[in-house]
Amino acid sequence: MDMRTTEQQYNPYRVFTRQQWAELRNDTPMTLEPGEFSKLRSMHDRLDLQEVEEIYLPLSRLLSMYVDAAQRLYYAQRQFLGIRDRKMPYIIGVAGSVSVGKSTTARVLQALLTRWSPRPKVDLITTDGFLYPNAVLERQGLMQKKGFPESYDLPRLLAFLSDIKAGRHPVRAPVYSHLSYDIVPNQWTEIDQPDILIVEGVNVLQTGPLPRDGKAVPVVSDFFDFSVYIDAEEAVLRRWYVKRFLSLRDTAFHDPRSYFNRYALLSDEEATATAIAIWERTNLANLEDNILPTRPRATLILKKGADHEIETVALRRL
């Protein structure tokens, strides 16, 4: 038997080249203006008309079908059970490594989905707000593992998602500041009955150990209806991270309020060495141990090349 045929037969994903995926756009209209691209794009990420047309419009079309099917199934179940539950929002998870461009993908999806007809309410949160405050991380010796699963207040995040799925409103999420690198005290983002909620974070597809007694232990992805994993080779991610670090050294790090202000006066050589050290000590370990192993759990995998362009799309078979 041809090994390639065997691998394809048992592959849980259908894999598309960029050209093949672009053809699935069909007649989905472009609803974004060119001037919006720079506002949606993260630092050094790629987002232009071609990327939206060839990657995100087909994805928007697919998601519209998934959301419609989920709504019909929900109403069928409600009719079968003879109950009148509150309407549940459709939740989309966006996962991937640091510096891969999760925020760009999440913002583009929010912008496109908001423009569907009729206009749904689409909210976006990041799991950064559910990190433990720095004081807690320092007390527990976890500052060097910030972003690892153990650095998140998982019970709080699960309670938040449970309330969202149950239709409770409004539901509050803590606010995180990338400037201070910490939770902002007494500030909240309110999520009030969205039709669609996008949840973005490095570890949103993470699972925990299964209990031996068989009791149900919820994980974040249990609340997702659809999930996207943004993928790239480790060497590429490392290069993007170093490039972003150098750019921040020249911009945000100069703010006296910045947690990383101490890096603002580093030379190019010093900044590069510092970025590589941080990558290898923290981000690479998190990628290899906690993030990359969750990739097979995604509904859709977007694989990027060295120029940030999405090269292949893998869609999980039904």
UniProtKB/Swiss-Prot annotation:
An annotated Gene Ontology molecular function: pantothenate kinase activity
InterPro entries registered for this protein in UniProt: P-loop_NTPase (IPR027417), PanK (IPR004566), PRK/URK (IPR006083)
Keywords carried by this UniProt record: ATP-binding, Coenzyme A biosynthesis, Cytoplasm, Kinase, Nucleotide-binding, Transferase
Catalytic activity field: (R)-pantothenate + ATP = (R)-4'-phosphopantothenate + ADP + H(+)
Pathway: Cofactor biosynthesis; coenzyme A biosynthesis; CoA from (R)-pantothenate: step 1/5
GO cellular component: cytoplasm
Subcellular location: Cytoplasm
EC number of this enzyme: 2.7.1.33
Binding locations of ATP: 96-103
Top EC group: transferase
GO biological process per UniProt: coenzyme A biosynthetic process
The UniProt record lists the keyword Ribosomal protein: no
Pfam assignment, any one: PRK
Gene3D superfamilies hit by this protein: P-loop containing nucleotide triphosphate hydrolases
Record NCBIfam families: panK_bact
Family: Belongs to the prokaryotic pantothenate kinase family.
Record-given protein name: Pantothenate kinase
Gene name in the database record: coaA
